[in-house]
């Protein structure tokens, strides 16, 4: 008999043939299955757009229709993320604000929330220390707890906090949200929980 090896085992991203044929704009769909990824030399005038899941898709030989529908939905939203430059690691967030907006959102707390945070982090609650406590202690610790990179931005921190809270509130991730829409969804959910 003859031995046959699926091309995915030898080269699971067959990009080379498209580059060799002279295509300049290539959309690469990644599923991160078994196999190798062959190195391809890409010229500077070739644009590679990558759609890749941020979660594991599981085994390639699982044939579950419900999981397949979920993967199709995930692929659709990951494609929207790539095309429209959506932010977020879990959610699909359309944002366009400047860095100072996110800093303001992170430090603008009412007195009760500020007091709660200062108590949780065992910091002095003097009003004169407000800015320094938040920017030099609380926000860097939050970034570390959320496992952000060492050179995190206020935008990254705010979106990470927003996403972590949305996940805890079990808000559906399969929708494109603006920052305000996701924050409002969270507030609605939290208001509903506190009303019980």
Annotate each PLM feature.
Residues 1-196:
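Patatin-like phospholipase
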